[in-house]
Amino acid sequence: MSKSLDISTTEAEQTVTEVIDTIVATTPDVRRAVADYRGQSNSVNPTGDDQLAADLRADELFEQRVLGIDGVASYASEERADVKTTDGRLHVAMDPLDGSSNLEPNSGMGTIFGIYSEQPPTVGTNLLAAGFVIYGPITSMVVARDGSVREYILEDGDKRVVDDDVTVPEDPTVFGFGGGVDSWTDEFESYAEAVRHELKLRYGGAMVADINQVLTYGGIFSYPALESRPEGKLRVQFEGHPMAYILESAGGRSSDGDQSLLEIEPDELHERTPLYLGNDDLIDRLEANID
C-alpha cells in the first residue's frame, strides 16, 4: 500500500534537498565503480536486461545512502524486483546507471532519479522533484523542482549552479529515435522520415545524454512503440516519469502517444511505455501522426 505524504511542506522540501545532496555526494563513488566494475554480473534485471557489475554496484551505493536519509520511506530501482522500505516520508525511484551498455566502448552514462510523495508504483503527478546525472568529460546534474530546472557541475561531491533556468530552446535542432528501424510502425516511420529532413541526428544510447541534447538544443527524443514491442522498452517509473517531469518543467512536452507521461499510473513497478519527449510542436505533430 502506498504511503501518503503526511508531513509539512517544509519537511518535504528538506527531505528533497537531502536526497539531491546525497546523490551528488555519491557520484564520485559511482564514477569509480564505472571504472572498477566493468565486467558482466551473470544476472539480469527484472525486465530482462543483462546487468553489469557496475549496475549492481551503483544500485547498492544509492540504496544504502538514500535509505539512510531519515525522511525517505522507500527506494525503488530498475535493477531490483521490489521496493525496499523503511520508516520515512518520501519515496525515491532510480535508474542507478543509465546507459551502462555504453561502458565497454567508454561512452556516455548517467543516473536518473525521481522523488515521489507516494510509494511506487504510482502516477507521475506525485513527483516532487526529478533529475539526472551525466558522467561525461565533466560530471553534470540537471534537477527539476518547484516548476523550474537547474543545471549543476559536480566536483568532489559538491555542486555549483551553471544555469539556474534551463528551458527547451524554441527552435529545435536535434532528434534521437531508439528501437530498430525495421520494427517501427508505419505511422512512426512516416513521422521520423519528415523529422530527418528537418533536424540533426543525435542518438548515443544513453537516455540521459540524449535528453540533455534536447534540453540544450531543442528537438525530440523517442523510444517508440514497436511492432515487436507495442508496450515500448523504457520503464515508466524509472525513466518515463522523471524525464517527463524535467522536460515539462523546462517548457517542453512529454507523451506516450496519447497523453502526458506524468498521467500514467503504472500497475506494476517495472511497467514499460512508449516515450516521446521534446518541443511542444514536435510532440503535437507526433501525436497527430500516430493517432
From Swiss-Prot:
Family annotation (SUPFAM superfamilies): Carbohydrate phosphatase
A Pfam family hit: FBPase
Keyword Protein biosynthesis: no
Pathway, per record: Carbohydrate biosynthesis; gluconeogenesis
GO biological process: fructose 1,6-bisphosphate metabolic process; fructose 6-phosphate metabolic process; fructose metabolic process; gluconeogenesis; sucrose biosynthetic process
Binding residue positions for substrate: 98-101, 203, 233
PANTHER family in the record: FRUCTOSE-1,6-BISPHOSPHATASE-RELATED, SEDOHEPTULOSE-1,7-BISPHOSPHATASE, CHLOROPLASTIC
Protein name: Fructose-1,6-bisphosphatase class 1 1
The species this protein was found in: Haloarcula marismortui (strain ATCC 43049 / DSM 3752 / JCM 8966 / VKM B-1809)
